[in-house]
From Swiss-Prot:
Record-given protein name: Tubulin alpha-8 chain
GO biological process: microtubule cytoskeleton organization; mitotic cell cycle; spermatid development; spermatogenesis
Lineage: Eukaryota, Metazoa, Chordata, Craniata, Vertebrata
Motif mapping: MREC motif: 1-4
Residues of the active site: E254
Recorded superkingdom: Eukaryota
Gene that this polypeptide is encoded by: Tuba8
């Protein structure tokens, strides 16, 4: 089997983990104590779900996951929550003191104490796999644990499991809603450190999700639970092809092959449709053509940027539910003709399609309506460079005054790391710019010199 191991780091990672495993359990008919419910045999017609769950001798199903936080409160909620019997106690790892929103604490001082234990637990999980496919790592960019500890973990995973793919689900700090002043520092330091270790990173911008909750789901004041449930639907769509049988299935490595043209350009933009509340869904048709075209609306994106200003390098459409290839082909053909989608000239209109027959499941009492079909679009577009530019600008404003830097240096970091990380991100912005320029323009430039 092609197993995936999920690693949830820091408060954001763990809370998204809660939402995701709650949804996975519902999707596979697994109850809160890990045993199969009555519907399970109907849903799991084969054993694809074992990519995410391992089965114990007495018929319990345990998530192939580790939750790590450098302070105990968030993971304690899991230990006392509804799904406390789902996880093995050793899968929930906590430290004593937190990283205090400080990358250096997560990566150097406090993180160093926990890393070996975490790797040991991960090793136990990998030993139970027959054909490990890779790791899914959930974390935020802004927190100390999410940024610092994740980057340390990624470095070590690269050492121990060199060839295995590592996919990130990263929470990008929201432009408006900030939880810490030093988010830009942490984000840029962690991006720089993990850039060479991550194969593909799906960024989720909190603010974009807030807006979707407000606009599409009519939630006036979205809570983290609302946000996380929406994020879990997206994670579920991306991983559905690993957990269910379908017509066109997509493997983890296949994502990379189709979405990542150059190793550094590995930040696909995620869009999901339909995001509708139950009241609205009742009155809407939501055909394949409709949900496909709403994927190209900036309103459905998980990161605030404008693809109409950028160019697409690759595009991957993951459908689930009541969808047939013919409808998809018609929908995509329509998009190609009427949309102002610009592909880079060196990559003619490449759409990769995956279809999965399992319709999206919704959490009872959640915000999303139960729909017959949904689509998740992963596109690699140069527009996402806007997100980096915003972050870099904030970094520059603070770093020009060397504000807050002493907290990092005090934890054993060198100031040079800041400028090194910032240069790396400047290079990343430049990479995106170059990828978007047309190849024939460059040839003309060469002749002039």
């Amino acid at each position: 089997m092609r197993e995936c191991i999920s690693v949830h780091v820091g408060q954001a990672g763990v809370q998204i983990g809660n939402a995701c495993w709650e949804l996975f359990c519902l999707e596979h008919g697994i109850q809160a104590d890990g045993t199969f419910g009555t519907q399970a045999s109907k849903i799991n017609d084969d054993d694809s779900f074992t990519t995410f769950f391992s089965e114990t001798g007495n018929g319990k199903h345990v998530p192939r996951a580790v939750m790590v936080d450098l302070e105990p409160t968030v993971v304690d909620e899991v230990r006392a929550g509804t799904y406390r019997q789902l996880f093995h106690p050793e899968q929930l790892i906590t430290g004593k003191e937190d990283a205090a929103n400080n990358y250096a604490r997560g990566h150097y001082t406090v993180g160093k104490e926990s890393i070996d234990l975490v790797l040991d637990r991960i090793r136990k999980l990998t030993d139970a796999c027959s054909g490990l496919q890779g790791f899914l790592i959930f974390h935020s960019f802004g927190g100390g644990t999410g940024s610092g500890f994740t980057s340390l973990l990624m470095e070590r995973l690269s050492l121990d499991y060199g060839k295995k793919s590592k996919l990130e689900f990263a929470i990008y700090p929201a432009p408006q809603v900030s939880t810490a002043v030093v988010e830009p520092y942490n984000s840029i330091l962690t991006t720089h450190t993990t850039l060479e270790h991550s194969d593909c990173a799906f960024m989720v911008d909190n603010e974009a999700i807030y807006d979707i909750c407000r606009r599409n789901l009519d939630i006036e004041r979205p809570t983290y639970t609302n946000l996380n449930r929406l994020i879990s639907q997206i994670v579920s769509s991306i991983t559905a092809s690993l957990r269910f049988d379908g017509a066109l299935n997509v493997d983890l490595t296949e994502f990379q092959t189709n979405l990542v043209p150059y190793p550094r350009i590995h930040f696909p933009l995620v869009t999901y449709a339909p995001i509708v509340s139950a009241e609205k869904a009742y009155h809407e048709q939501l055909s394949v053509a409709e949900i496909t075209s709403s994927c190209f609306e900036p309103n459905s994106q998980m990161v605030k940027c404008d693809p109409r200003h950028g160019k697409y390098m690759a595009c991957c459409m993951l459908y689930r539910g009541d969808v047939v290839p013919k409808d998809v082909n018609v929908a995509i053909a329509a998009i190609k003709t009427k949309r102002t989608i610009q592909f880079v000239d060196w990559c003619p209109t490449g759409f990769k399609v995956g279809i999965n027959y399992q319709p999206p499941t919704v959490v009872p009492g959640g915000d999303l309506a139960k729909v017959q079909r949904a689509v998740c679009m992963l596109s690699n577009t140069t527009a996402i460079a806007e997100a980096w530019a915003r972050l870099d600008h904030k970094f520059d404003l603070m770093y020009a005054k060397r504000a807050f830097v002493h907290w990092y240096v005090g934890e054993g970091m060198e100031e040079g790391e800041f400028s090194e990380a910032r240069e790396d991100l400047a290079a990343l912005e430049k990479d995106y710019e170059e990828v978007g320029t047309d190849s024939f323009e460059e040839e003309n430039e060469g002749e002039e010199f």
